[in-house]
Amino acid sequence: PAVIIVLVTGIVFGLVQGFLVAYMDIQPFIVTLAGMFFARGMTAIISKDMISITNETFMAWAKMKLYLPFGGYLNKKGVMVYPYMYPTVVIALVFLVLAFIMLKYTKFGRSIYAVGGNEQSALMMGLNVRRVKLKAYVLDGFLCGVGSILFCINTLGGFVEQAKGFEMDAIASSVIGGTLLTGGVGNVIGTLFGVLIKATIEAFITFQGTLSSWWTRITIAALLCFFIVLQSILAMVKKKN
């Protein structure tokens, strides 16, 4: 029941925010920022303390390892060791593939690109821009619910301050992966590479040992600024040509 409640809550959040953006013409940044503050405030009302997950199914999924049939090697004891993945990673990759197919090969996916690129052109093409926006926000809310479930499986708990600042990490990863902030350009594969680049930087700084963890934020911020400036330059060149 808890999983269903989380998914439904995500859909409701997406529906409300999508309605405010698409039909009330409120700025998306304001709507989503207010929604984030509202959701975080509601979690604080529910509990300000850490809530541990003791459900046996969740705990089993958190400990489960899916071994890959390739890439094995002999350890020092002469035992063959194979690489493995956690179920949450596999589920995330499945959703990644589905999102790629949806955006690239379906009418709804192409409509999202059209609306993101130029709303007026999309209207002239006969697209129902408001409906496309609403559907996109509902889908986003559902995926946020899925992501929160996977995150809780990994951490086996929930806390009001959990995932604080992840919204900026998501924006940075998307921009580094080639998504234009002006809309209409980007794909989930590029975003995946953006996430991997960010994770590589974090791992390097962590294992380097002599650098403060704040250097991660500084490096990501510098990369974000660089790619935004690069996008602006490319847009100016394209417009000039």
What kind of feature is each model-predicted range?
Residues 30, 128-152, 168:
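Transmembrane alpha-helices
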Residues 4, 24, 28-106, 132-134, ...:
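Transmembrane helix-bundle core of multi-pass membrane transporters
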Residues 1-8, 30, 89-94, 134-138, ...:
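Hydrophobic alpha-helical transmembrane segments
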Residues 7-10, 36, 40-42, 89-102, ...:
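Hydrophobic core segments of alpha-helical transmembrane domains in multi-pass membrane transport
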Residues 124-131, 201-241:
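Cytosolic-side transmembrane-helix boundaries in multi-pass membrane proteins
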Residues 98-137:
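Membrane-helix/interface signature in polytopic inner-membrane proteins
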Residues 14, 138, 143-144, 154-221:
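Transmembrane alpha-helical segments in multi-pass inner-membrane proteins
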Residues 1-37, 193-194:
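Alpha-helical transmembrane segments within multi-pass membrane transporters and channels
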